[in-house]
């Protein structure tokens, strides 16, 4: 991922994202209001990535409903983003951004 895209993501997210994703072959995410405060998906997926020697990482992305459209637009332009999961209340709103 380019540093500019990383910086753009950092501006709209409410949590810090690790710079380690800049060096990953790919990354995934759990998107919601505050998955950084307790979502266990990153723990599960990151241990799987490590076990299978994948240079990948799942990160939580805390985003407001207001910034969800911006986030989805940014993620579509990042080749190393390979998908992920979404929590309520974003789960219903995010459907219109998925092809």
Task: Please give the residue ranges for each predicted region.
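Short N-terminal or domain-adjacent regulatory/targeting segments
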Residues: 1-20
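Phosphate/diphosphate ligand-binding glycine-rich loop within oxidoreductases
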Residues: 23-99
């Amino acid at each position: 991922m380019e540093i500019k895209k990383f910086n753009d993501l950092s501006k709209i997210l409410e949590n810090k994202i690790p710079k380690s994703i800049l060096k990953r072959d790919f990354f995934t995410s759990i998107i919601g209001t505050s998955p950084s405060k307790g979502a266990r998906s990153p723990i599960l997926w990151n241990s799987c990535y490590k076990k299978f020697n994948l240079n990948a990482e799942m990160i939580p992305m805390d985003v407001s409903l207001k910034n969800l459209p911006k986030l989805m637009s940014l993620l579509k332009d990042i080749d190393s983003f390979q998908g992920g999961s979404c929590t309520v209340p974003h789960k219903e709103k995010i459907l219109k951004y998925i092809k």
